[in-house]
């Protein structure tokens, strides 16, 4: 009887709190990328250009990039459950303001406010998930939490796009705010109060990392390799409508197909990067660069364009786990006192990449046209290929 009671208690203290974290991750993942499917309707309704609407993605990314390391350090002394609840309040407020926005300026501010909750959530969420389970199940617990992000890409973004097309883009943001309400209730009820508190993050630890060459190189690889795809992905809906020739009503279905490709790629990428992340990343980036270049030539053809876009999705997020493992491995080797801070800074690097990619994509759309976004994104990813080769050379010499 006692063993059964302990098993039930273990499930309560592990699986259910992880579900609450996954719900939060699903909401955050949905709000980050859902504007991709709504760019055209947002631009038309607010009477702005597609390029300006693209700032809703790059602006959000910069909010995460600057907010993650700075706010993680500033809030390090707060109780982790209290901080988790505060982050979801910010998330709800940000999306509610977005839904009420009548101007582009207010909508952009709302997006940046929402972004502040993103970076810190994934910084503390991973450590909370790890502490909820036995040590030999920590990796699985963290993976379960991040499943919320994958599910958001597969279902949240296409569903949000469908809702936006059927009822207007404001309805999508109200729906995401409702997700935040569900997440905060789940966190309040299911996440335990007696969480082990992590040691405070220090700005001095961030400075140590920023002085380390191999880690700085890995952040540059993250920004270029992950961000290059966003030169085209940010404008995927206009590409599908204006180049490939799909009706706006078909975009949500195609984003669902893209999301399935992302989910498959995530699974493959995690397994491929287990033994030698640098080698795996080199080949992932090289193939992705080639696919992006090909897309510029196939985008105007429905069948070939759709197949190439699916392939782009397959590779787009395949590198994420490898990039995270690479940074953690390097931090443990060079700056062992600041592994968590290095992980937070890599989240910032991901979002710097998104911001750069989205911004560059906007410049291309305005200057030489939508069809050129994929191959220029491919050039950006090719930069990551070269940096990865350099990093492999450095690590080989260090052995």
Language model: regions and residue ranges:
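Paired small-residue
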Residues: 90-97, 102-114, 303-311
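Conserved MFS/SLC helix-loop-helix module at the cytosolic interface between two early adjacent transmembrane helices
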Residues: 66-105
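Helix-breaking motifs and short loop linkers at transmembrane-helix boundaries and internal kinks
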Residues: 47, 79, 100-106, 117, ...
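Intracellular juxtamembrane helix-capping segments at the cytosolic ends
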Residues: 121-133, 318-334
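Helix-to-loop junctions at the C-terminal end of transmembrane segments
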Residues: 68-79, 265-277, 365
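A late C-terminal transmembrane helix in Major Facilitator Superfamily
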Residues: 330-368
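Helix-loop-helix hairpin linking two adjacent transmembrane segments in secondary transporters
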Residues: 102-106, 121, 134-195, 222-225, ...
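Extracytoplasmic
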Residues: 17-50, 68, 232-237
């Amino acid at each position: 009887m006692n063993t059964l009671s302990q098993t039930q208690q273990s499930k309560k203290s592990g699986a259910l709190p992880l579900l609450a974290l996954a719900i939060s991750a699903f909401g955050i993942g949905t709000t980050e990328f859902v504007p991709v499917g709504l760019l055209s309707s947002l631009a038309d309704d607010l009477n702005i250009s597609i390029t300006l609407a693209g700032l809703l993605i790059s602006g959000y990314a910069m909010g995460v990039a600057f907010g993650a390391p700075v706010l993680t350090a500033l809030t390090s002394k707060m109780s982790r459950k209290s901080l988790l609840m505060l982050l979801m309040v910010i998330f709800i407020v940000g999306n509610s303001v977005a839904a009420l926005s009548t101007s582009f300026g207010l909508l952009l501010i709302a997006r940046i406010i929402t972004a502040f909750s993103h970076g810190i959530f994934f910084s503390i969420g991973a450590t909370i998930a790890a502490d909820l389970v036995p040590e030999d199940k920590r990796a699985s617990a963290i993976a379960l939490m991040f499943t919320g992000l994958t599910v958001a890409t597969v279902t949240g973004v296409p569903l949000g796009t469908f809702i936006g097309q059927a009822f207007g883009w404001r309805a999508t943001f109200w729906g995401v705010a409702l997700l935040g309400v569900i997440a905060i209730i789940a966190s309040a009820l299911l996440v335990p109060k007696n969480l082990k508190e992590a040691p405070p993050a220090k700005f001095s630890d961030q400075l140590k990392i920023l002085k380390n060459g191999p880690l700085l190189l890995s952040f540059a690889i993250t920004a270029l390799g992950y961000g290059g795809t966003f030169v085209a992905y940010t404008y995927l809906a206009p590409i599908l409508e204006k180049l490939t020739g799909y009706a706006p009503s078909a975009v949500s279905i195609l984003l669902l197909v893209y999301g399935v490709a992302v989910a498959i790629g995530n699974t493959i990428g995690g397994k491929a990067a287990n033994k030698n992340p640098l080698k795996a990343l080199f080949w992932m980036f090289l193939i992705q660069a080639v696919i992006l270049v090909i897309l510029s030539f196939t985008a105007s053809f429905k069948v070939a364009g759709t197949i190439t876009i699916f392939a782009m999705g397959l590779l787009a997020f395949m590198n994420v786990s490898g990039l995270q493992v690479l940074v953690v491995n390097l931090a443990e080797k060079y700056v062992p006192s600041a592994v968590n801070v290095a992980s937070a800074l890599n989240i910032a690097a991901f979002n710097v990449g998104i911001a750069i990619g989205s911004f560059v994509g906007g410049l291309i759309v305005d200057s030489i046209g939508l069809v050129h976004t994929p191959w220029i994104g491919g050039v950006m990813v090719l930069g990551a290929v070269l940096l990865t080769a350099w990093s492999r050379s450095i690590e080989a010499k260090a052995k």
